From Swiss-Prot:
Described function: Hemoglobin-like protein that exhibits an unusual concentration-independent binding of O(2) and CO. Required for general plant development and during nodulation. May promote shoot organogenesis from root explants.
Signal peptide: none
SUPFAM superfamilies: Globin-like (SSF46458)
Gene designation per UniProt: GLB3-2
Record InterPro entries: GlbO/GLB3-like, Globin-like_sf, Globin/Proto, Hemoglobin_trunc
Lineage of source species: Eukaryota, Viridiplantae, Streptophyta, Embryophyta, Tracheophyta
Keywords for the protein's UniProt record, in alphabetical order: Heme, Iron, Metal-binding, Nodulation, Oxygen transport, Transport
Assembly information from the UniProt record: Homodimer when ferric.
Protein name: Group 2 truncated hemoglobin 3-2
Length: 169
């Protein structure tokens, strides 16, 4: 049986080494708190305004945007070298468990990544190297969550278009 990390690498097309290259540089020190706040604000503004894929926006219908922004930037700060803001306020991140109530499908991961790529591209003060490292981490982590979701719903998953060397027909 493949590990969740192996599935995440296969489905995302991002190796674990590429995904965790965010640990080579303290991105929090490099970018600063305000950049992470801006990134998360930019991301959730896109999510809550998503009129192309209303099914995706509806996933967040029971969440207050301000809380979603704070949860995300605090997690990013903590994961990328800053103080443990998320854990101090919410406890261990436990990403799979925290996302369990939501439909974490290949389609949802792709839509999340679409909005995150746009947010990264339009958030000032994030250099190209940091964007690449962050996006590799986000892509791998999104599919780690999909793999975790598959454990609880093994018959609901459809392979994603990025699955390395797989025929998705």
């Amino acid at each position: 049986m493949q590990s969740l990390q192996q599935k995440a690498s296969e489905w995302s097309g991002v190796s674990t080494d590429e995904a965790f290259s965010i640990d080579e540089t303290n991105l929090f020190q490099k970018l600063g708190l305000q950049t992470f706040i801006n990134l998360s604000t930019n991301f959730y503004n896109r999510v809550y305004d998503d009129e192309e894929e209303e099914w995706f926006r509806s996933i967040f219908a029971n969440s207050k945007k301000e809380e979603a922004i704070q949860n995300q930037y605090e997690f990013f700060v903590q994961r990328m070298g800053g103080p443990p803001l998320f854990s101090q306020r919410r406890g261990h991140p436990a990403l799979i468990g925290r996302h369990q109530p939501f439909p974490v499908t290949h389609q949802a991961a792709e839509r999340w990544l679409h909005h995150m790529q746009l947010a990264l591209d339009t958030t000032p003060d994030i250099d190209d190297d940091s964007k690449i490292k962050m996006m590799n981490f986000f892509r791998h982590t999104a599919y780690f969550l999909v793999a975790g979701d598959e454990l609880k719903n093994p018959n609901q998953q459809i392979p994603c278009k990025h699955a390395a060397g797989k025929d998705n027909s």
